């Protein structure tokens, strides 16, 4: 069917999402969120170092002397 566009019906769920009250995260979700934030912070720090001097960053992790 070349030249014909198919239109998909929009979900009615999106109309009701704003009306639903926000539920607080479960304790496990809060802990996972905190762990994720820590990882994100570490990755941001690594990105910053790589942007400034990638060669020095790599040298710091190269094993020297067969260790």
Swiss-Prot record:
GO molecular function annotation: proteasome binding; protein tag activity
> What processes in GO biological process is this protein linked to?
modification-dependent protein catabolic process; proteasomal protein catabolic process; protein pupylation
Biased composition annotated in UniProt, kind: Low complexity? 1-11
Spans annotated as ARC ATPase binding: 25-61
Carrying Deamidated glutamine, the residues are 67
**According to its UniProt record, how is this protein modified after translation?**
Is modified by deamidation of its C-terminal glutamine to glutamate by the deamidase Dop, a prerequisite to the subsequent pupylation process.
Which pathway does the protein contribute to?
Protein degradation; proteasomal Pup-dependent pathway
Source taxon at top rank: Bacteria
Q: Region entry Disordered: which residue ranges? A: 1-47
Q: Which keywords fit this entry according to its UniProt record?
A: Isopeptide bond, Ubl conjugation pathway
Claim: Plastid is one of the keywords in the record: no
Quaternary form?
A: Strongly interacts with the proteasome-associated ATPase ARC through a hydrophobic interface; the interacting region of Pup lies in its C-terminal half. There is one Pup binding site per ARC hexamer ring.
Q: Which family does it belong to?
A: Belongs to the prokaryotic ubiquitin-like protein family.
Function as written in the Swiss-Prot or TrEMBL entry: Protein modifier that is covalently attached to lysine residues of substrate proteins, thereby targeting them for proteasomal degradation. The tagging system is termed pupylation.
Query: What domain notes does the record hold?
Result: The N-terminal unstructured half of Pup provides a signal required to initiate unfolding and degradation by the proteasome but is not needed for pupylation, while the C-terminal helical half of Pup interacts with ARC to target proteins to the proteasome.
- Official protein name in the record: Prokaryotic ubiquitin-like protein Pup
Organism in which the protein naturally occurs? Arthrobacter sp. (strain FB24)
């Amino acid at each position: 069917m070349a030249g014909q566009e198919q239109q998909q019906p929009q979900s009615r769920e999106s109309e009701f999402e704003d009306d639903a009250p926000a539920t607080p995260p479960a304790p496990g979700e809060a802990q996972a969120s905190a762990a994720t934030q820590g990882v994100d912070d570490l990755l941001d720090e690594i990105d910053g170092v790589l942007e400034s001097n990638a060669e020095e960053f790599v040298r710091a992790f190269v094993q020297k002397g067969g260790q």
